[in-house]
């Protein structure tokens, strides 16, 4: 009996051992004796950089970028240790701001901020959401070498010292999260974020180290400045396994090595049907669809991917309407409409082409709201019908291979004979 999450609910599936291609999740890794000491030691031994306390001067202002509710990074446990380092250099709390790098996600509510950052931090330093559409709080700094406009949060740019804190996970289309990603798309403007995502719209990039999006992020960071990063690798319970700090490129590459150790999971047989459970990252389809790209790497061409992701907030709170409209068009038409400036939400265009890539190569089935599923032109299956469907497919094909990926938004399947 295979147990798999659909949100917090556990579904039990009877998949014969001879038909099970794989049943995988992120690799188990020893948890440090002290999570806080792991973080503290990382700050004491940064990679490619001086210690943070040796970078800042007592009269300087500091902005800390932290991720939002769609990421599991324990900001409430990391930031206090970073503050210790800043305070030891003579920085006062009123010289520090935390900007939540929401990218184009919706702003976090006060309750969500308290849950992720803690009431103590909220009382200690100023914490605010980035707003990618508030042009009064953005600055245009020209273009990158690829021509992407450098539009960035004004308060971030005006700070003397800028620190990014985030997590390391496989990510499409960037390859891996972490590093300069906290800056772009984290605190960039709408056009900048959209153009970056369009760079990786049509090719599978999950788990790659050098990608067009990653290069653009790092060019962007080189232009506007990102003095220090703190990146963590976590287990499925949100415990910090490894912390890497320092230069936004050199430290990030070291962190990615650890990411491969934890999230790179070997399998030896491709599946005809892959069940991809995204729990706990299943807020909306623009987050849950990461489980499609993970499953792509483990599914036979022309096979089926079934995404188990409730997506309680629908397609995407800030991009859903445009994504729903664009679902009727192929990539050529979307590129044509972009060229003719017929699409205002360019990020939604990138997301739509990501999904077109999956639909072109696989039968893609969603276990979420049936209306949204239909609008997005995916196949639909309910949680109550999944077992019957698998039984039916097994009766038709006794050699059918079924694979299961748990917490699929953080798994990088790696084929190994």
Language-model-detected regions and their locations in the chain:
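N-terminal amphipathic/basic leader segments beginning at the initiator methionine
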Residues: 1-42
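Glycine-rich phosphate/diphosphate-binding loops that line cofactor/substrate pockets in enzymes
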Residues: 47-63, 88-94, 265-272, 299-300, ...
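Short glycine-rich or small-residue beta-strand-to-loop segments that form or flank ligand, phosphate
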Residues: 61-72, 97-103, 274-277
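Histidine-anchored nucleotide/phosphate-binding helix
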Residues: 71-91, 288-299
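C-terminal non-catalytic interaction/assembly regions of soluble proteins
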Residues: 87, 289-417
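Membrane-embedded hairpin module used as a gating/binding unit in multi-pass transport
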Residues: 207-281
